[in-house]
């Protein structure tokens, strides 16, 4: 028996039947041809801008950049997130609230100091309202008047000079006024004539000082 002849005959007999459609399908039995056919498709899909980003225009920002820009806005920075801005907005009113309170305390302190200074000026009529500028001018004039009185006492032979002491005394302003009253009588202006009217409550201090300061 001829093996070659029988093999050729058997092989020829095997191919005499009509081939099945699945036997020549390139998807199952042709990986090389399948890769060759699909390679242009993948290359065009990767390199084509229209296929690569169908939802975004060509040359535009990446999806992550577009999402970030939509969330924060074109000019926003990551540090200016809405939550951070709300937190800063909640803290700012509390910081501003301390400003008016501090300014109010400062104004009250200044007003109290001027009120004490007005009380130190002697013979101020009860119906007279002094502004801060007039209070400072009268206080300056009164200090000059007291220094002139002390200078006259020093010329008379008194060895002690006036010294300003910043110590609190028990008597307070009343004792200070009592100490100043003898000095005020020594520097009285000349007696007024019968035709001149003397203003009540302004004795002990030259009347022209009041006339000059209150008329300004």
Curated annotation (Swiss-Prot):
Subcellular location(s) of the protein: Nucleus, Nucleoplasm; Nucleus, Nucleolus
GO MF annotations in UniProt: bHLH transcription factor binding; DNA binding; DNA-binding transcription activator activity, RNA polymerase II-specific; DNA-binding transcription factor activity, RNA polymerase II-specific; DNA-binding transcription repressor activity, RNA polymerase II-specific; enzyme binding; identical protein binding; protein homodimerization activity
Superkingdom of source: Eukaryota
Transmembrane segments: none
Keyword Transcription: yes
Annotated GO CC locations: cytoplasm; nucleolus; nucleoplasm; nucleus; RNA polymerase II transcription regulator complex
Residues where Phosphothreonine is found: 107
Entry keyword set: Activator, Developmental protein, DNA-binding, Nucleus, Phosphoprotein, Transcription, Transcription regulation
Gene Ontology biological process terms, A to Z: angiogenesis; blastocyst development; cardiac left ventricle formation; cardiac right ventricle formation; cardiac septum morphogenesis; cartilage morphogenesis; cell differentiation; determination of heart left/right asymmetry
Residues that bear Phosphoserine: 109
Record Gene3D superfamilies: Helix-loop-helix DNA-binding domain
Entries under InterPro entries matching the protein: bHLH_dom, E-box_TF_Regulators, HLH_DNA-bd_sf
Post-translational note: Phosphorylation by PLK4 disrupts the interaction with MDFIC and leads to translocation into the nucleoplasm, allowing dimerization and transcription factor activity.
Biased composition (Basic residues): 8-18, 92-104
SUPFAM superfamilies in the record: HLH, helix-loop-helix DNA-binding domain
Spans annotated as Disordered: 1-20, 73-109, 165-203
Keyword Transcription regulation among UniProt keywords: yes
Pfam family, one: HLH
All residue ranges annotated as the bHLH domain in the record: 94-146
Sequence ranges of Basic and acidic residues compositional bias: 165-174
Subunit structure: Efficient DNA binding requires dimerization with another bHLH protein. Forms homodimers and heterodimers with TCF3 gene products E12 and E47, HAND2 and HEY1, HEY2 and HEYL (hairy-related transcription factors). Interacts with MDFIC. Interacts with SOX15; the interaction enhances HAND1-induced differentiation of trophoblast giant cells.
UniProt function note: Transcription factor that plays an essential role in both trophoblast giant cell differentiation and in cardiac morphogenesis. Binds the DNA sequence 5'-NRTCTG-3' (non-canonical E-box). Acts as a transcriptional repressor of SOX15. In the adult, could be required for ongoing expression of cardiac-specific genes.
The protein's name in its UniProt record: Heart- and neural crest derivatives-expressed protein 1
Lineage: Eukaryota, Metazoa, Chordata, Craniata, Vertebrata
